[in-house]
C-alpha cells in the first residue's frame, strides 16, 4: 500500500460507516408502519430524505434505494424492485440538486424535497399499477402515497431548515 492510497482513508471509513448505519436504520424503519385503508404508511421516508440531503449521490442511492429494497425484501417482498428504483432515483436526484446548489440554501432544500416527493408518488403509483396489475389499486393508494411522501419530506425539511 502506497502512502497516496491512504490519503482520505479516514473520510472513506466515515462515509462507509455512515452509509451502512443509515441503510440499517432505513431497513429497520421499513418494519414500522401506520395502517391505512388498503395498506400501510411507512416511516422510512424520513431516513431516505435525510440521506439524500446529507450524502453524495452514491451514498444517497445506497441508503435510499438499497436500504428500502432490503426493508421490502425482509418485510414485504412484492414491491421491492419498485422501492429500489423509486427511492434510488429520488435519492440521487435530491442529492445532485443539493450538492450542486447548496445544502444550506433553504429554497433549494425545499425544492429538492418537493421534487423527491413527486418522484416517490409517481414511482410508487406506476409501480403498484404494474406489480398488482390493476390501475384501480394504484389509484386507491395514491392519497396515502402523497401523505407518506409529505410526512417524510415535511419532517426533514422542517428540521433541516430550522437548524
Where are these regions (language model features)?
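Loop-helix junctions at membrane interfaces
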Residues: 1-161
Amino acid at each position: 500500500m502506497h502512502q497516496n492510497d491512504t490519503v482520505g482513508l479516514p473520510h472513506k471509513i466515515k462515509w462507509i460507516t455512515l452509509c451502512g448505519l443509515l441503510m440499517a436504520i432505513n431497513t429497520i424503519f421499513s418494519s414500522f408502519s401506520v395502517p391505512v385503508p388498503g395498506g400501510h404508511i411507512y416511516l422510512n421516508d424520513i431516513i431516505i430524505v435525510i440521506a439524500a440531503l446529507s450524502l453524495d449521490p452514491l451514498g444517497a442511492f445506497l441508503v435510499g434505494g438499497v436500504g428500502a429494497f432490503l426493508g421490502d425484501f425482509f418485510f414485504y417482498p412484492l414491491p421491492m424492485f419498485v422501492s429500489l428504483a423509486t427511492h434510488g432515483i429520488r435519492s440521487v436526484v435530491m442529492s445532485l440538486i443539493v450538492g450542486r446548489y447548496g445544502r444550506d440554501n433553504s429554497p433549494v432544500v425545499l425544492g429538492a424535497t418537493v421534487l423527491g416527493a413527486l418522484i416517490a408518488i409517481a414511482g410508487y403509483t406506476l409501480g403498484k399499477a404494474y406489480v398488482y396489475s390493476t390501475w384501480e389499486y394504484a389509484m386507491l393508494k395514491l392519497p396515502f402515497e402523497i401523505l407518506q411522501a409529505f410526512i417524510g419530506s415535511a419532517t426533514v425539511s422542517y428540521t433541516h431548515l430550522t437548524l
